[in-house]
Amino acid sequence: SSDVCSSDLGDIVQGNIRIKTQGEKFSALLYVTSINGFHPSEGQKRYNFENMTPIFPNERLIMERPGGTTAMRIVDLISPIGKGQRGMIVSPPKAGKTTLLKDVAKSILRNNKEMHLIILLIDERPEEVTDIKEAIQGSNVEVIYSTFDELPEHHKRVSEMVVERARRLVEHKQDVVILLDS
């Protein structure tokens, strides 16, 4: 008998594949070993994002860290960030938004090890993507990007996939931060 497991947009499915034959374009997935890092049976226990209750931020994310920048201390004092909060950095070009974003990412990794961090880079230069991928690394970090040479439809599709990915992780009771640079 074969077990059937379902996956949704945003799930990362791992498993064993069958070697493709000459007429096939893709290899077939023979056996699913994990969905989002969990055993496939865990997927049936996960919550449905649409049925979850939104709440106001009630747990703070500390940005100051040893060896970090003064900017993160200022964020903690002037504009503290809480889990579940949305925020925006607005500034003219070349004012340091990407540098601030990297500082925030490093602080989240250092001070909130349970957080899953997704960094979404839209309409960026490939060099900036490489810089962030090298600067921000970890087992709970995903850097997703759509460079400036991609079509706007691709930017939109990548953005929607990141939101769905975050939803799937939240359904598994994981805390997720999306940092968007566009």
Where are these regions (language model features)?
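Loop/turn positions that initiate beta-strands
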Residues: 8-12, 84
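OB-fold/S1-family single-stranded nucleic acid-binding modules
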Residues: 18-45
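Short, small-residue-biased leader/transition segments that mark boundaries at the very start
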Residues: 4-6
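Phosphate-binding/switch loop-helix module in NTP-utilizing enzymes
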Residues: 155-182
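Conserved ASCE P-loop NTPase core motifs with emphasis on AAA+ ATPases
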Residues: 45-57
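Phosphate-binding glycine-rich loops and their immediate beta-loop-alpha structural context
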Residues: 54-159
